[in-house]
């Protein structure tokens, strides 16, 4: 015999009017907020990733590829100097 945790059954929660009143507002709001976060470019600023037009500059058109095992720090410094 299984015990009772005192929580409402999931079927009761998703069939209640109160659940859908709350979530009919919050789910679209989260979607719109995420879309604005990405479309305005704020995601690039917050996470520090380069924008699509900043991957290759006028000075550096090659892919920044680390090729040496023992001088990798020097190569990273060389790549970051171009920014």
UniProtKB/Swiss-Prot annotation:
Main location: plastid
Cofactor, how bound (note): With its partner (PsbF) binds heme. PSII binds additional chlorophylls, carotenoids and specific lipids.
Transmembrane segments: 21-35
Subunit comment: Heterodimer of an alpha subunit and a beta subunit. PSII is composed of 1 copy each of membrane proteins PsbA, PsbB, PsbC, PsbD, PsbE, PsbF, PsbH, PsbI, PsbJ, PsbK, PsbL, PsbM, PsbT, PsbX, PsbY, PsbZ, Psb30/Ycf12, at least 3 peripheral proteins of the oxygen-evolving complex and a large number of cofactors. It forms dimeric complexes.
Cofactor annotation: heme b
Residues reported to bind heme: 23
Native species: Anthoceros angustus (Hornwort)
Name of the protein described by the UniProt record: Cytochrome b559 subunit alpha
Role summary: This b-type cytochrome is tightly associated with the reaction center of photosystem II (PSII). PSII is a light-driven water:plastoquinone oxidoreductase that uses light energy to abstract electrons from H(2)O, generating O(2) and a proton gradient subsequently used for ATP formation. It consists of a core antenna complex that captures photons, and an electron transfer chain that converts photonic excitation into a charge separation.
Topology class, membrane: Single-pass membrane protein
GO CC terms in record: chloroplast thylakoid membrane; photosystem II reaction center
GO BP terms: photosynthetic electron transport chain
GO molecular function: electron transfer activity; heme binding; iron ion binding
Similarity comment text for this entry: Belongs to the PsbE/PsbF family.
Superkingdom of origin organism: Eukaryota
Record InterPro entries: PSII_cyt_b559_asu (IPR006217), PSII_cyt_b559_asu_sf (IPR037025), PSII_cyt_b559_CS (IPR006216), PSII_cyt_b559_N (IPR013081), PSII_cytb559_asu_lum (IPR013082)
